[in-house]
């Protein structure tokens, strides 16, 4: 039914103070946004609400239409229980400086083009730079090969005597980095003052180290003990015997004992990343060279590669280190390169913040680069990395699939271990929350018959549901990772609208997030102030046009005189207008889709109202008369209809004329006559299907499930909003496209999904309201002995299957495919429906709104000022 989508948003609380006549304005805390839309700024954090107000005047009549016999105005309705709940921020947005936005966009475009060429930015690692600085010159062993690295070490010591990230004190990182720098300085016998300050820091802080609380650095159990051993040999005055070091020694011995040397020498594993910590093992360093990446590194680790060079004097290893030093301004990071990881996370961040509208071409270039390294076994963090991981593979799989690249979920098979467990790397002992979150997100873009993604979804979902809120992630220190997890679990991919998702992530996004490897590091192109400022600016920009568009819709409602319809069960009223409007704003938010938003909102109102009327129908004779008028599509026959049918038909008719005029200006290749026939045909098809529904109800007829679905797929009406709105979605259209689009596979899947999710959630309520014809009852009639639960299981399985088919239809480009924005609108129409009838909701949101849905709509209205 038409109301299934829009009615739920009717409950979110924007109040309407309405009288018949000319619209006076849309008010926030008494300020008229119609006359003062962008000039006023309200107090920040004030609790303002929207009121729609009209001044008294004679009600305008419909053009070319005279409504005879209209009843007197009804008494003002008492306020509905859901009114007055939703508030918009008191801090009104002003016109934005587009020059500043343009500068931000230009800066980010520069970053993306750098990533597309394999370049990026990562913070230097004192630990790794110190390892590289140990290397002696080939021509004179008394001199360093990289004197600039030694100079950087001395100049980068922090005021407290330590080395490491200067904006965040992570004790393990500071101690390890400081120890590495001291060993290097002591080896070259330089920087005595720096050594003194560094040893003082270690003496004061090593005793503060505690047993692993889940925040140890990657490989710390092997790298730190080895550094202690070397420091002791050099005579550094630091505490070697502490409770922590004793416990760590026990843990390290156990870990080293489990390492199979044959595997270490024969196949690339994560052990290659920390070879400098494995020097006590009987390693054949010449065999290790066979596991070298093509760039000369060992798993893109400068410190591990430096260790191998010190053992072997391998020229390829040295060349890698020389390249890294030159490229990174003589202070190497803990990963080099990290190009695939960085590129994927930059694109993901841009899309989650909702600013990808500025960077379509640049994102395509970055993803082309990433895709060139995709394999059937997944992907690693760098283009030369020989070990793939589930985190990068999941992120790459999801983003590449959503952008139409051909990627196979078989890449996840290698991460599935005996005992029904997934791992990030082979040999991993514990999970990180962030990797499971990315796996969970990737699992939701599945196609039919992809069993491995069913496994990944269940595994990651169960893990995230049960993870301790105090759990420390292995791979990142983020602003609010558990907040991200909670939001993702509550808002599955198909059940969340774009701007709701974007605005939520604006709250969770951290400009100063840290990443964890052998040391902590930063990715300035992933976490920065520019992204957040641009995201906030765009969120505000999306609000600038809203008052004028909503005002236009309110004026239209009053000119249509819907409130004159005499029906005691009519739930459609002007209060639903803001909710319908903000739903489409949360989806097609771009400024160029202004006409689409307005006409979509009108279509939703009309369909909701007419669906209500069909639910109330009791006369076969009146239905026959209505069908005759609809099929002939003749406004002169509207006087034959009772008032409750006459008013909406006249508005259907007038809306088609208005839309025809607007669409004709856009699609000059299409005649107005063709467009008018196209639009009237849509409404004719819809209304005839709703008449059939009403006829079945009056006659008490329960059809077979197949017969029911054939009509119910039409009466659900969501396809109507798609077919009408595509005229304004910015795509060139032809008569052939418009004549065949209804029968296209995406539209067919849309109709099935929307009907099924409606029936699954509302069948009990509709039975109580005397509407026995719905999917559950038809299935039970066709399968004698089947219970309601049996019917629901069948409908739910059919729904999930069809959602996977919709994913495939949307993300994969097919021959003779629909234009991109049409596919997008169709997909988002389904998401609008699914967010309304989420499987966790067991009520009819048309009559019983819930706080969760209200909160979601608040996201559409909020402007975040976090800078």
Swiss-Prot record:
Binding site for Mg(2+) 1: 611, 615
CC cofactor: Mg(2+)
Gene Ontology terms: biological process: 5alpha,9alpha,10beta-labda-8(20),13-dien-15-yl diphosphate biosynthetic process; 5alpha,9alpha,10beta-labda-8(20),13-dien-15-yl diphosphate catabolic process; diterpenoid biosynthetic process; miltiradiene biosynthetic process
Keywords, ordered alphabetically: Chloroplast, Isomerase, Lyase, Magnesium, Metal-binding, Plastid, Transit peptide
Predominant subcellular localization, coarse grouping: plastid
Residues at which Mg(2+) 4 binds: 389, 391
Record's subcellular location: Plastid, Chloroplast
Record carries keyword Metal-binding: yes
EC number: 5.5.1.12, 4.2.3.131
Residues the entry annotates as binding Mg(2+) 2: 611, 615
Residue numbers binding substrate: 255, 474
Residue positions binding Mg(2+) 3: 758, 762, 766
Catalytic activity: (+)-copalyl diphosphate = miltiradiene + diphosphate; (2E,6E,10E)-geranylgeranyl diphosphate = (+)-copalyl diphosphate
InterPro entries: Isoprenoid_synthase_dom_sf, Terpene_synth_N, Terpene_synth_N_sf, Terpene_synthase-like, Terpene_synthase_metal-bd, Terpenoid_cyclase/PrenylTrfase
Transit peptide: 1-55
Pfam family, one: Terpene_synth_C
Pathway assigned in UniProt: Secondary metabolite biosynthesis; terpenoid biosynthesis
Single Gene Ontology MF annotation: terpene synthase activity
Gene Ontology terms: cellular component: chloroplast
Cofactor-binding details, from the entry: Binds 3 Mg(2+) ions per subunit.
Record note on domains: The Asp-Xaa-Asp-Asp (DXDD) and Asp-Asp-Xaa-Xaa-Asp/Glu (DDXXD/E) motifs are important for the catalytic activities, presumably through binding to Mg(2+).
Note: S.moellendorffii contains two distinct types of functional terpene synthases (TPS) genes, the typical seed plants TPS genes (SmTPSs) and the microbial type TPS genes (SmMTPSLs).
PANTHER family membership: ENT-COPALYL DIPHOSPHATE SYNTHASE, CHLOROPLASTIC
The protein's name in its UniProt record: Bifunctional diterpene synthase, chloroplastic
Organism of origin: Selaginella moellendorffii (Spikemoss)
Gene: MDS
